[in-house]
Amino acid sequence: MDHDNDKKRLHEDSDNSEIKKHKPLDVLSEDGPLTQKDVVYFKKEAIWRQMRSYKQKCTLLTRDLNDIKSNYESNERKINVLDSWYESIINLFGVKKESNVELNETILIQLTNVPIGDLDALLEKRRAQLLTILSPIIENSKLSNIDKSDVLEKIEVLNAEVATLKSENNTLSKLKSQFESKVEDLQAQLLTLVKDNDRRSSKTLQRIDESLTNGSDVKEEASETVKSEVNKDTTVKNENSVDNEEFERISSEIEELKSDNRLLKESMNQINTNYDKVVKENLQLSDKLENLNENDLINSVSYQELAAHNKQLNESVNNLQKINDTTVNKLNELENKQTNVKHLLDKELREENETLKQQLQKSENDLVRIRTARDELLSKQTILKADFENQTTNDELNKLNKVLNERINALESERHETGDNSKISELSKDELIQRINMLNSEIKEIEQAFQETRENSLSKLMSVTDQENMVKKLTIEKTKADQKYFASMRLKDSLSSENKILKTQINKSQELVSKLNDLEKSYLDKIEILTKSNNDFKIIRQSALQENSKLQESLRAIDVRKASLEKELSGMKDKYSDKVQENTSFTQELNEKNLMMGKLEHKLKSTESLLKKYKTNNTSSILQEDERQLEALRSIAKCSVCSKNWKDTAITVCGHVFCSGCTQERLAARLRRCPTCNKGFSANDLLSIHL
């Protein structure tokens, strides 16, 4: 339906474009009563002012939105750069997950939001990678010999910094909220000032104000013209009216004189009665001042107030003294408790420190012993490896020796089998001798080689047996060393578990220390508050004593003043006669003024009676003009449909203004057309205004 209406509007605008170009602008009338065109002009200008205020709000919102967008874009660029840096760091270090390494989850902050999207998944991945890199580095960089005093000092410094930062944060948040509220107030004031400026510069409002002021002027001018016309008519019609006016004037003067006489008599009677009262009161006061008693002083209001104030001050001083004594006792008790707690904590910390140092020394000694045993075992292992290699070479030599012996035996058997006596007999004696010598030399060489090989084999066998014995001994020592190693590892595990327990105890003790530090700070704050209150009480006591002394001095001054007043009384009696004379002069002046007032009142009554006469003759035309102007103003401000409610909703399609109730009723009844021009509108075309 709204889409069809928009189409109709576009069609109508396109058809009537040429007519709108030649259509003259609306003009506000400058004088005379307000017309219907002036009312329409007034409505349009009100809508224009409201649209300008909406535009200003929109510009402010767009400016804020642009600032937020620029901040968002800069933050997104920074996040992308930081992500690339972290990715390059992770790639440089290389992420390799190890099963033995425990991730320290307290290093990096976890994500707080529950729904995990793409960005949250990426951040979780980066966090896991950084934890795998940082946790082993932090574990390796932890020192075993940590000084507790340094740790406690650092904790105290950090706690102090945290407290200061919290206080600064609270103050800054309060300042921020105050500045935000001030900025909102200033924006609202600026908008109201802009609206007021628009209303001041609007022609229609100036025209209405002029019409309202001109209405009163018109009434006065009309009354004056009526008077002049009446006078003219009376002079033309009847010349005897002058005599009537003179008669009325004389009668009014006589009445004025009578009223003046009556006022003079009343004022004289009042003056006489007042004079008698004043004389009596003066005599009574003089008698009282001459004969002042203690009862009069006690019954005096100032004396009672001073006495009550003195009592209150004494009671407050006593109460403050009691409170001071109780606070001093509490302070002493708190100081004693604080010293006892400090001594206990120092004792416990020293004992725990000594036990930890002893356990650490034991573990270091055991570690040195285990390392020496390990080094010995490694050296023996290298020796055994070398001996094992020598044994393999000996086995190979023995195999070679066996092969050579077998070869010699085979050659000898062949020699015996192939040796023919016929050949030997064929040889000569010299050849036989040479051959025998050669054989003897060969036999000697063979025997020598055999002996050498035999000695080598025997020495090798001896060394092998020695090595086997050594291996057996070393295996026994190795088993012993393994047992010692396993025992030391068990001891190491127990020490590591004890170390963890001690670490947890140290953490608990540190938490207790931090809690005790907080308690100490709170106690110190309380002590400071109590000392301040004690000082305040002392100051109050001193001030009370000073006030008491001042009151005593004031009482003495009152006694002195009493004597001086008695002296002044005689002087006052002398002055009384002067005052009586002044009183008579004042009474005369007052009587004269009363006479003047009576005359003026009588003139006012006479003028009012004349005005009533003139108003009864010619006031119908003025009243009709006033009614017309009032109806015009009502038509501007009241709804033309129901004529009950004020106009507060404008239809932006045609510019007509009605009340919100009538527009909503028409929308609910699906009568979506303007009652005056019959143009279609929707709920989006309504605009709330303030006339």
UniProtKB/Swiss-Prot annotation:
Keyword entries, A-Z: Chromatin regulator, Coiled coil, Metal-binding, Nucleus, Transferase, Ubl conjugation pathway, Zinc, Zinc-finger
GO biological process: chromatin organization; protein ubiquitination
GO molecular function, one term: zinc ion binding
RING-type zinc finger span: 639-678
Subcellular location: Nucleus
PROSITE patterns listed in its UniProt record: ZF_RING_2
Residues in coiled coil: 49-83, 147-459, 491-620
Pathway noted in the entry: Protein modification; protein ubiquitination
Listed InterPro entries: E3_ubiquit_lig_Bre1, Znf_RING, Znf_RING/FYVE/PHD
Reactions accelerated catalytically: S-ubiquitinyl-[E2 ubiquitin-conjugating enzyme]-L-cysteine + [acceptor protein]-L-lysine = [E2 ubiquitin-conjugating enzyme]-L-cysteine + N(6)-ubiquitinyl-[acceptor protein]-L-lysine
GO CC annotations on file: HULC complex; nucleus
The protein's Enzyme Commission number: 2.3.2.27
Disulfide bridge map: none
Main location: nucleus
Source organism, top-level taxon: Eukaryota
A Pfam family: BRE1
Sequence segments annotated as region (Disordered): 1-24, 211-231
Basic and acidic residues biased stretches: 1-19, 217-231
Claim: Metal-binding is one of the keywords in the record: yes
Keyword Lipid metabolism carried by entry: no
Function: E3 ubiquitin-protein ligase that mediates monoubiquitination of histone H2B to form H2BK123ub1. H2BK123ub1 gives a specific tag for epigenetic transcriptional activation and is also a prerequisite for H3K4me and H3K79me formation.
Family in the record: Belongs to the BRE1 family.
PANTHER family membership: E3 UBIQUITIN-PROTEIN LIGASE BRE1 (PTHR23163:SF0), RING FINGER PROTEIN-RELATED (PTHR23163)
Name of the protein in question: E3 ubiquitin-protein ligase BRE1
